[in-house]
Amino acid sequence: MNLERIPNEEKLSLCRRYYLGGFAFLPFLWLVNILWFFKEAFLKPAYTEQPQIKSYVKKSALGLLLWVAVLTTWITVFQHFRAQWGEVGDYLSFTIPLGTA
C-alpha cells in the first residue's frame, strides 16, 4: 500500500483500525501496523496527526512483543511438559508425536 497518496486523517484512521484489530487475537495486524507506519511516525517531518500515529505504532510494538513473549513461553512449556501432563497433554495436542509419552 502506498501511504504517500492517502491523506493524513485517513492514515490515522487506518493506523488506529490496525491497532484495535490486534486486540481480536490478530497480532499480525500489529506487525503490519509497525511495518507500514514506522516511517510515518518517526521519520517524516512533523504534522498534526503524527503524535497519535506514533502512539499507535509504539502500542502496537508493545502488544506484539508481549504476544510473542507469551506465545513463546507457552510453546516452550507445552513442548517440555506435554508428556508429563499425560491425558491432558494429549487432549491439548492436535497430533500426538511418536516417542515417549
UniProtKB/Swiss-Prot annotation:
GO terms for cellular component: endoplasmic reticulum membrane; gamma-secretase complex; Golgi cisterna membrane; membrane. Pfam families: PEN-2 (PF10251). Residues 79-101 are lumenal. Keywords: Cell membrane, Endoplasmic reticulum, Golgi apparatus, Membrane, Notch signaling pathway, Transmembrane, Transmembrane helix. Residues 18-36 dip into the membrane without crossing it. One of its GO terms (biological process) is Notch receptor processing. The chain crosses the membrane at residues 58-78. It comes from the Eukaryota. Its main location: endoplasmic reticulum. Residues 1-17, 37-57 are cytoplasmic. InterPro entries: Gamma_Secretase_Asp_P_PEN2 (IPR019379). It is found in: Endoplasmic reticulum membrane; Golgi apparatus, Golgi stack membrane; Cell membrane; Membrane. It is a multi-pass membrane protein. Belongs to the PEN-2 family. PANTHER family: GAMMA-SECRETASE SUBUNIT PEN-2. Essential subunit of the gamma-secretase complex, an endoprotease complex that catalyzes the intramembrane cleavage of integral membrane proteins such as Notch receptors and APP (amyloid-beta precursor protein). The gamma-secretase complex plays a role in Notch and Wnt signaling cascades and regulation of downstream processes via its role in processing key regulatory proteins. The functional gamma-secretase complex is composed of at least four polypeptides: a presenilin homodimer (psen1 or psen2), nicastrin (ncstn), aph1 (aph1a or aph1b) and psenen. This is Gamma-secretase subunit PEN-2. The gene is psenen.
